[in-house]
Curated annotation (Swiss-Prot):
Native source organism of the sequence: Syntrophotalea carbinolica (strain DSM 2380 / NBRC 103641 / GraBd1) (Pelobacter carbinolicus)
Molecular function GO terms recorded: guanosine phosphorylase activity; purine-nucleoside phosphorylase activity; thymidine phosphorylase activity; uridine phosphorylase activity
Keyword Transcription in record: no
Matching InterPro entries: Ppnp, RmlC-like_jellyroll, RmlC_Cupin_sf
Record's catalysed reaction(s): a purine D-ribonucleoside + phosphate = a purine nucleobase + alpha-D-ribose 1-phosphate; adenosine + phosphate = alpha-D-ribose 1-phosphate + adenine; cytidine + phosphate = cytosine + alpha-D-ribose 1-phosphate; guanosine + phosphate = alpha-D-ribose 1-phosphate + guanine
Family that this chain belongs to: Belongs to the nucleoside phosphorylase PpnP family.
Coiled-coil residue windows: none
Protein name (Swiss-Prot/TrEMBL): Pyrimidine/purine nucleoside phosphorylase
HAMAP family attached to this UniProt entry: Nucleos_phosphorylase_PpnP
Cited SUPFAM superfamilies: RmlC-like cupins
Enzyme class: transferase
TM annotation in the entry: none
GO (cellular component) term, any one: cytosol
UniProt entry keywords in alphabetical sequence: Glycosyltransferase, Transferase
Length: 104
């Protein structure tokens, strides 16, 4: 899906790591949420409350998923899931464009 229709967009950005990771929240009519964002090169760790699906829209990232011992590479067109109430780490070597879907 390259565009979303009939949604509410929160204007205020979600800003992390001194602006190196930013996103905007999109709310759908059924109440589900996604964020569309950009990550600049760096290393980041995030905690989850809800389960998430991270879809790569551009660039790439190395991901250390919860419980994993090895890093995995994800590129444009690929996605990965992160369980609720967990933590995952990212290594970004080039600008990464992503869509994060929050699962209920």
């Amino acid at each position: 899906m390259s565009e979303f229709k009939n949604v509410t967009l929160i204007k205020k950005a979600n800003v992390y790591y001194d602006g190196k990771v930013t996103s905007r929240t999109v709310i759908f009519a059924d109440g589900t949420k996604k964020t569309l964002g950009i990550m600049m090169p760096g290393e980041y760790t995030f905690d989850t409350a809800a389960a998430e699906v991270m879809e790569m829209l551009g660039g790439s990232m190395e991901v250390l998923l919860p419980g994993a011992e090895t890093w995995q590479s994800f590129h444009e067109g690929q996605s990965f899931e992160v369980p609720a109430n967990s933590q995952f780490s990212l290594k970004i070597k080039e600008v990464a464009d992503y869509c994060c879907s929050y699962l209920k």
